[in-house]
Amino acid sequence: MKAISSRTIVLASLVGFAVGGKIYTLNECVRGEGFYDSFNFENITDPTHGRVTYVNRTTAESLNLTYATSDTFILRADDTTVLGVNDTGRNSVRIRSNRWYHEHVVVFDIQHMPEGCGTWPAIWETKESDWPASGEIDILEGANNVVPNQSTLHTSHNCSMSNHTHQTGTFLTTNCDASVAYNVGCGVQHTRDNNSFGPGFNRIGGGWYAMERTLHYIKVWFWERDDPCVPLDVRTGAWIIDTEHWGIPAANFRNSTECDIRSHFGANNIIIDLTFCGDWAGNPAIYNASGCPLDCVTYVNNNPSAFTNAYFQISSMTVYE
């Protein structure tokens, strides 16, 4: 499908502000072909050692791995090619925002996310050239269709979270230090909602992910498409939002004597990608526990049709500051 239109709205006349870390104004709204203007395609070797080849924009468009309508952006992987043992990996896409972000709120309206054994989709923030010193925030991430979603921080030394925090999710680990335990980070599972990831997410038509980063905390919310509790300012993409009325977040990473958010997070980009296997999805213990067949690389190499549903369909990304 040929990309036919775009709309990127940057509200330069609105100077973003926050009152008490709760009230924000719209700074950027990205839809459709606007993703081409707001993001770079990263034609790089996968730092997570996935069975993937990240292609540039020209290749992505020619292979139909990205395309857009007036209100939708698609990012997907190849689903036709059987890979040989000497091939570098399945063609896919990794995009990085042109802008850097400090304190902000970002909201993603997502209709569909990649699913399938061997898949490892993610929407996250980091500064690649200064990782982990500038921190990493994984907003949406998972592997091999295993539910629910997991939101995770990865940092430099001396950052741990308290288990006693006001959130609906459950901490799997509390030490965010990337040098500890093979970089598992401090992860929170969205245990209240198995539709927050994978096939269940897609069956309900997706929903909204939001992340708020301040000097004192980082919060992540998820609302299903038909959730009556979706805040009106989220559902409508309002010019002004008030996170105070968004309810209890799924993940709530807070300042403490064990971690100073300000000193562990710098100016970061937003990254959206889809890899296969690699350090997480391809870990034999994790892959086998997910109930997926064969080993990860063999499966990904030989079953291209299994990845027909391995795509992001994103309606919009809105940023508030």
Task: For every predicted segment, state its role.
Residues A3-G20:
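Cleavable N-terminal signal peptides of Sec/SRP-targeted secreted and luminal proteins
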